[in-house]
């Protein structure tokens, strides 16, 4: 019901922007509006469809934020205007309680935080849709990043994926032109990628393999994995300072050439493809 309420509030089915929806879909949209957002029957949205879709994903939470980010990479499927809006979909959410962080770590590894770390920052350095990251120091002095999945994220993932799969079936059935976009296949691929993200052992294994492949290559630094402090919902890895690839000003301030950096990234990408 919450999903339908948000879709109705954003008027996605009644005012779909540049998209031409079948009359049957629009009628369903108006019925939803009448039930969940009555005033939407009498007012037109001020924002573009792309902006409203972005807001909708954000309001619906972690899995939808990830799905929106995935869609943003496919302007060929959803159109340039919508893709550009979805690029601004921030993967940032309020952090969950540090008490829960302590409980998860201590129950998983059978030791108190104080026995595992010399320092453990209570405030996360990043809180995203799937997990949050805390900076810490091990007993041997190593500075590490500890990434912990959000509580109940796996249950929310399964619930939200079932709704997305249901939505894909509806779209495939009612919108004939949408079949060529293969919505059910898109959701299936998304399910697989999310399955990978929700098991941090997979992320750790991929990082370890990459570390081995680039061990004699100084063009790329892969953080070391601390396997003794890694599980399906917690990963501990070497702390590495860095700058976002999107922060062009900081990159230039560091004395780097953005074009040269982009070229190196391209080479690294192809090296991964050939080495793996």
Regions found by a protein language model. Give the residues of each.
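Broad phosphate/nucleotide-binding scaffolds in NTP-utilizing and phosphate-metabolizing enzymes
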Residues: 1-272
């Amino acid at each position: 019901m919450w999903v339908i309420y948000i879709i109705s509030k954003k008027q996605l089915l009644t005012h779909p922007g540049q998209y031409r929806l079948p009359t049957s879909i629009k009628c369903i949209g108006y019925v939803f509006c009448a039930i969940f957002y009555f005033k939407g029957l009498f007012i037109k949205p001020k924002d573009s469809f792309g902006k409203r879709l972005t807001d909708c994903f954000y309001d619906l939470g972690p899995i939808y934020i990830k799905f929106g980010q995935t869609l943003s990479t496919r302007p060929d499927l959803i159109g340039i205007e919508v893709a550009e809006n979805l690029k601004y979909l921030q993967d940032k959410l309020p952090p969950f309680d540090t008490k829960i962080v302590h409980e998860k770590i201590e129950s998983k590894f059978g030791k108190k935080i104080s026995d595992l770390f010399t320092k453990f920052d209570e405030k996360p350095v990043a809180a995203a849709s799937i997990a949050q990251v805390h900076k810490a120091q091990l007993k041997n002095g190593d500075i590490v990043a500890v990434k912990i999945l959000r509580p109940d994220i796996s249950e929310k993932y399964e619930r939200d994926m079932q709704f997305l799969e249901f939505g894909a079936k509806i779209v495939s059935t009612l919108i004939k032109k949408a079949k060529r976009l293969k919505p059910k296949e898109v959701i299936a691929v998304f399910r697989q990628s999310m399955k990978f993200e929700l098991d941090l052992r997979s992320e750790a294994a991929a990082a370890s393999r990459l570390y081995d492949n680039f061990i004699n290559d100084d063009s790329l630094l892969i953080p070391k994995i601390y396997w003794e402090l890694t599980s399906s919902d917690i990963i501990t890895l070497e702390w590495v300072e860095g700058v976002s690839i999107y922060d062009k000003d900081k990159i230039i301030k560091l004395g780097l050439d953005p074009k040269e950096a982009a070229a190196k990234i391209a080479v690294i990408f192809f090296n991964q493809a050939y080495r793996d």
